[in-house]
Amino acid sequence: ILAHFFIKGCEWVKGGNCYSGDGQHYQNILLAGIGEDGNEATNEVTYLVLDILEELNIGDFPTTVRLNRNTPEKLLRRVCEVIRYGGGAVAVYCEDVVLRALTDFGYPREEAVRFANDGCWEVQIPGKTNFGYLPFDALQILQHRTLRDYGGDVAFASFDDLYAAFAGDLAGAVREMADVLCGEFAGRRADGTWQWNPKPPCTVISLFEEDCIGRGLSYYEGGAVYNIRSPHIGGIADTVNSLYAIRKLVFD
């Protein structure tokens, strides 16, 4: 029955063109990890889902496993066995890192342990979050801003100078995105909180996302418990490789 459920997840019935060609609904399944009671949540269904993914080798529903320092070795081995087939059928979260990041950001521990991913892989607290992001490419910043499109009019005395310039350009790009995000707000209320610009009503989401009713605000006007806007960096691996190559070939 569960295998048939996964197969149904691959059936697309659409009335128009789709902007994305990656063939996923973004309805994610999260396995294992620390439960709200503080205990490991791995169970028989965890392994059953992994068996299905291995046998069917399909991408829907996207499945991620939460791993931590106390993850059973049996589960670690099983996850590796499924991943080796490729296709990105199973992703993993380093749960210890994610929980530390969330609590450092201000989430209560009891909320942080409930984390799941949204449509892609960004973590959030399900049922309580309005999440959005602005994507940007770190490699483009290195190429176009720091190295000025390789125009020959840029020079650095050391790799540290180059890296400092890149870090400054990266920070500048984030500040520009922050300015864009500020456009979502009409200003501050008397109590100092931000007031969102008026948005079209979204009754269904507002009914199901926690605290929209309590706050008397639409989901798109700040009604959810957590309203998150984030810079979404891409090209990290290419950027790191490029910086390393420059350091080795030019400065070392």
Predicted features and spans:
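Conserved catalytic cores of very large enzyme subunits
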Residues: 1-252
